[in-house]
Amino acid sequence: MHYDVVIIGAGMSGLAAGIRLAYYNKRVCIVEKHYRVGGLNSFYSLGKHRFDVGLHAMTNYVPKGVKSAPLPKLLRQLKLTVDDFALCPQRMSVIKFPDKALRFNNGFDFFVQEIADNFPRQADNFQKLLRTISEYDELNLYTKPISARQVVSSIISDPLLVDMIFCPLMFYGNAQEGDMEFGQFVIMFKSIFKEGLARPEAGVRHILDVLVKKYKSCGGELKVRCAVTGLKCTNGRVVSISLENGETLTADRILSSAGYVETMKLLANHDSSKLNYQAGQLSFVEFILILNKEPAEMGYNTAITFYNNSDRFDYRKPDKLVDVSSGVICCPNNFQFENPLPEGIIRITNMANFDFWNKLS
């Protein structure tokens, strides 16, 4: 079977790419090895409970009617509206360290005041950081990468405040140990602090349902339980993919959202010794707790807590199975839903060592 475009992986990026291509009359096929779409952001059922995995909340939330922010722009590209995702904003989140706590909601002025109240000597420096962020072109792909730690620490002189600012940005949008590229820092700072967090009442499955429905309505084809076993190259470009069921698909263009390392391993003439790549070092483990009452009834009203219990925030691969000294605690119940969720849920995410987990019998 021949297509204009074949996309490997039905995660959010694969589905979004498929929508764009199919909308403009390309014959598109997305192949997904699992029986559910979503990739790292998916869902499953166990007993009578429904669980989301991956996505805690959507960043870049802005009130309806704002048109110039990234999320409305993205939705327009996908021919969707804000109402399609049925997003409900957070109530309040917090960055909690041993000696300080900084609250934030979807009103940026509130966060600015929290900085001034908790770090009065850094108030002017924080304003300087805001000017630096607003003047930086984070979308310029030709900008030379620079250390975000270096830039921020040259402006904010209190290491504690530096760590507290970095904590949520790293957990929600950084694949680099210890530091992050300043352009990525700017993107995450704007998306979490200047814009905000929200989620649909039905969780990630609602977002995925919307994307799949839109993709199919544009004429896109979706094959699930359809693992790719190999990529065939001719004259330096991939021309076809082999599927686990024995089928071969050809296409003018083949896109992969499976990850660089995973994609390279699919090449028919793959030789890892000749390919210069490094697998990511960061992994996470999640604990999901089901409660018999609303968390607010127990005095817990926070949507998301980004915490660190150590003297310094050390964002890196731990030397043990799980590092519980820092992490993210998400309570889906504490978003501004019209109706209460069926049950209380607490999701705890911590950094983990994949190598140690992979060796467990």
Q: Where do the language-model regions lie?
A:
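N-terminal glycine-rich phosphate/pyrophosphate-binding loop and immediately adjacent elements
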Residues: M1-R121
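FAD-binding beta-loop-beta segment adjacent to the flavin cofactor pocket
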Residues: F43, E177-M180, Q336-E343
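Glycine-rich phosphate/pyrophosphate-binding beta-alpha loops
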Residues: L55-Y61, L169-N174, F284-E286
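Rossmann-like flavin
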Residues: K96-E181
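Active-site-adjacent "gating/activation" loops or surface patches in catalytic cores
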Residues: F171-A198
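Helical element adjacent to the flavin cofactor pocket in flavoenzyme catalytic cores
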Residues: M188-V238
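Mid-domain catalytic core of redox enzymes
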Residues: T229-P340
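FAD-dependent oxidoreductase catalytic-site/capping-region signature
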Residues: V328-I329, N333-S361
